[in-house]
A protein has these predicted regions:
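Catalytic cores of carbohydrate-active enzymes across secretory and cytosolic contexts
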Residues: 1-180
Length: 180
């Protein structure tokens, strides 16, 4: 039997209570890590490694490599942005962290390959090659794989904006992690 008023389901003598629980992140943990010297050092090293100078604005996406996350639509939007606003070439870089998932499923491997191919095509179309002492510029810095918590917080700290473009998602903590 079901008691909607008490949110209880009784089945074969077993009682199950249904509750809605808001999911969140540990704000203090993220905030403390973001203020740490480890993250400060990582920020400087990461900017150098990526060739992103202080004046360059950074956008960020952190997603599982899953079609529900809207990564292809995001990449198309970024391509459109760089097509329409060439004045942002060299002044805006999008850092995409893509965390592999379901690698044993062929459709997910094909999706991963499509994402990689699209990032490469966009970068080839717009990137500025290195000359002399300059590191050059790529519109999209693509990082595939799991990242350590301090590295993730470093990316959040470096970012001027983050995009969450899920087309179908039950819960997504990226926005909460970013503002923490």
């Amino acid at each position: 039997s079901i008691d909607p008023a008490k949110a209880i389901v009784l089945y074969r003598g077993h009682q199950t209570r249904l509750t809605a629980r808001a999911i969140s992140v540990n704000f203090s943990q993220f905030s403390d890590l973001a203020k740490s010297m480890e993250v400060e050092d990582l920020m400087a090293r990461t900017r150098r490694r990526l060739g992103v100078s202080r004046g360059v604005r950074i956008g960020l996406g952190v997603d599982r490599l899953d079609y529900t996350k809207g990564l292809m639509k995001r990449l198309w939007a970024l391509k459109d942005f760089f097509d329409r606003y060439p004045e942002y070439h060299g002044k805006f870089t999008f850092l995409q962290v893509a965390i592999p998932t379901r690698n044993n499923v062929e459709a997910y491997r094909q999706y991963r390959d499509l994402i990689r191919k699209t990032v490469t095509e966009i970068n080839e179309q717009f990137e500025v090659p290195p000359e002399g002492k300059t590191k050059g510029w790529k519109p999209i810095e693509y990082i595939e794989g799991r990242v350590a918590p301090a590295t993730l917080v470093t990316y959040y700290r470096m970012a001027d904006l983050t995009l969450v473009t899920s087309v179908y998602d039950g819960m997504n903590l990226v926005a909460k992690e970013y503002v923490a």
